[in-house]
């Protein structure tokens, strides 16, 4: 599936988090992931939160389906407690 993103958000995330939407999101989605719909707010679109692994570290990606593309909104490494919760679901 094609990945799209806002170039400015990609650049910010690359500088501040060392994660690249263009390359790293595809790596995460090529492995085992768990995905849940984000119901916290009305975003005007269905946003999904996926957790998976990038080079052995757990990553969370917020994204939405746009046509046939997966549009990445944010991406970051998980914190300790958060990773424990996601690992329970991934098992």
What residues fall within each predicted segment?
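Ribonuclease/tRNase effector modules and their secretory precursors
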Residues: 1-91
């Amino acid at each position: 599936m094609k990945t799209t993103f806002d170039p400015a958000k990609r650049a910010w995330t690359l500088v501040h988090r060392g994660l690249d939407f263009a390359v790293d999101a595809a790596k995460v989605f090529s492995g085992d992931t768990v995905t849940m719909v984000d119901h916290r707010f009305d975003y005007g679109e269905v946003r999904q939160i996926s957790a998976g692994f990038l080079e052995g570290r757990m990553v969370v990606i917020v994204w939405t389906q746009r046509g046939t593309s997966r549009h990445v909104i944010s991406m970051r490494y998980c914190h300790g407690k958060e990773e424990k919760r996601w690992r329970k679901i991934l098992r």
